[in-house]
């Protein structure tokens, strides 16, 4: 028996099977088979067993049956193979794995390449640092590198350790870049990329293919590495440098992960450090930045490596940003990174240099631009940001374009884009696009443009696969738009997104401050924009670089007063520039935010500036915008990359332009870049901004579309402005140059916003398609989006966000943005939290509760007067008060969530509710007209939009144009589309969808949009959202059903994409949303489903609309219609839970916005037999209700 037990025990240990024969099966290890000793103790003394065997102290159960619980010994059995003694010694602990000493030696001694390979894995090993320190060898090359430029020299020597390598490396690539800018950039950089990617990569080119794909971070690093080498193109050591860089970069680049960490950590430290150097002296900043970076970066890199996993998708940007920033900062800080120090300078420097094969050119230009340093600094900063932050990164090129003088930096910006490209594949696509766009748009910086193109092309070519990969990733990021946003705007996001947000708000404010520092704070539309944009980007870049400092610092540095004052200035200026178009908006934008919104419309940059204040006020919006921008850029990038990448030259203006504008507006946060780039480089700005905008525009579009919807519908004038913009946009699209010029003249920002807006006529398509695809789902969003897009094809979306959202959000952004700011900021640490992070969700929820209700009421009400739409939006965003006032308590219930998510969703959700609620009421009032006009105007642009988003937008665009007369028709169509789409892409249960941002409207919309049932009760929800009674009447009678569906669907979908991180992450529905684009996910998913959805969904939607049009019936009828048409089964469910829920939704949903918010209707749609998420909504409705 004992033996048997022992044997059994052994086998049990080995096979995890207890001897069945023994009673030791009991909880107590009477004779635990796993204990060999047990047998002996059993045989001998129980005491022995107990004593001998740690866990089975007592062999005999009787002795201590309880004491000898198998539970613990069970663990030990894992070590059954070990002798009991050994087991006892080990307990269950496995010998502590120890890194072989080799690693340290290897890493330290080994070539950076090898070490890096290992180092990446073993980031904790100090050798990584030694490897990088080993790069000091690279430092010597930098001395030769100094030739590129004194700033670089300064940077190089100071930056010596990390940067020298890039300079060294740079020489070969720069010549290549210089000689064959496009190919060399592409070709030479690949080696650097290889080198950067991994020392071995330098050694083994084969790795290059893999590294690009392999290294989302590495490519950024690679780009960083290659760009840095290009930066010090002059560096003679270039030949050796590549390897050195390979080695050196490899430690930074090769050890992509920790390099990213290094970039992040070092950069943050560097940024922090650099932030002082930043202003002190660019050269010194460069030197300081690099020096601190080398030390900080490498030391910090040790710590950072663990995060590497996240970095892969989000950090690449940061890596690229920071590594290049760092390197560039060191290399290029002195030259052009005046405002933004090392951090930003580094990267643009690398990329500027890479962009500008000739470092001298870059540095020279940078130096030459040194006087224009603010600009160049901005440009580079923007370039840096672009490289550094995908969302900002895209703006980077824009800054460059805006800054012809910094044109050299622009190319560097382009290279940063490559960094961004690699770093952020979504942006990468944009990067390419921006680069290509930049070249296309940057004829001015043609020299850079070639290099830019080279950079762009190299990056593009370098990542031809990367391009595909980027597109794929963009799709993935679109799916995970938020995620990427979270990543981009998370890593960079918190840094870039939050800081871009903050940087765009704060950095932008700092930018303003920087501009203030740079005198051209608001002063020159062009320069301020550039300076502001650049500075903003620089600051934003700095913000990304100085993640916390920037965020904390910028907000402090650029206090709201500054924002206010700048905002006033911008308002004044925008009044002139934006008054052109924004005057209606302004008229409609009684609230400053409104004005600002209008201006944002017109002056994405200007308004961005305002938005900066607004951003300040609307950190959420900014955040949303930035992340949204990031998202949208991705969204755009996915579709826009092809459109943009494909028609970069042709469409870039459009795609780029309007994206630039939306980016501008969208990038309201990032808009400074866009604004800067937008006006000056509408294309590039749009291209880059398109990237940023695409990324940002997704959420931004969502937000902006929401805002625009809000503004547009809520702000009839805004909408008219939007229409005006839309029409002008179309006219401008046609007369984009003129408008762009005019706006640029007015203010680069305004131009940026409007040029895109103007361009949006032509380039609005992307915007439309972006927001449209994005929010196209929202038929009114289509209308709005289209108007938004139409109004500011780019500026519209961007500006709508800024305008609508700023109008709505600025008013409510204080609530919304502040909440977002809070949302973004960790309550304890004050750090910017990732968008999708649990803390962010918690903060968002808390903010929603607090601000949605308190600020929501105050802001919503406050904004309310400003523009119904706006206030509605705000109310919605702030929602609580307005959702009730809106008559869609449910609707606005969501808004409370929205306040925090207001930027995220509130823009969309709010917009939707606004569009629905205010729009319903307002539709009745004239929003409908406005909307119709918007729709009408968007219609042309819708075609443009769908032109771009042909499949996605086309249905939406066409539905809009088709049913344009009767928004309900477009709404219907959209609803149908949306519903169809919703049916197709059924978002996750609202709880999941909403978790990230539980905004009810967004959620409801999401739910609605998510699932046709939700859409069905989206009607209901819309009703609840917009006001069960009014929305049905208005929404359903009008396009609200459609708009709601579109809005709910599109918005929801968008929300799903933008709003619900969880949904986006976890759910296919959301991913659908995301994959299409942010817009694709939202718009494309909606759009695409809309495309095919209108036919299938059309009848349903129409039915719904019919039902929906009957205001009373609309609630139920649409629900039933949609239900019956779209969900026969769902209807049963709807009816059972849905009917009740619907009754509840209208009743409970209406009265309790909570229900609406939680989508009592969502409850209804909990179970959808035929859908992807059959049980999405029951939980949702009930859950939300319960939650509510």
From Swiss-Prot:
Modified residues (Phosphoserine): 260
Asymmetric dimethylarginine modified-residue sites: 1044, 1157
Compositionally biased intervals (Low complexity): 432-441, 618-633, 689-703, 1026-1035
Presence of keyword Phosphoprotein: yes
Region feature Disordered, mapped onto this chain: 126-468, 484-771, 790-823, 847-1039, 1069-1160
Protein name per the record: Uncharacterized protein C6orf132
Signal peptide range: none
Claim: Phosphoprotein is one of the keywords in the record: yes
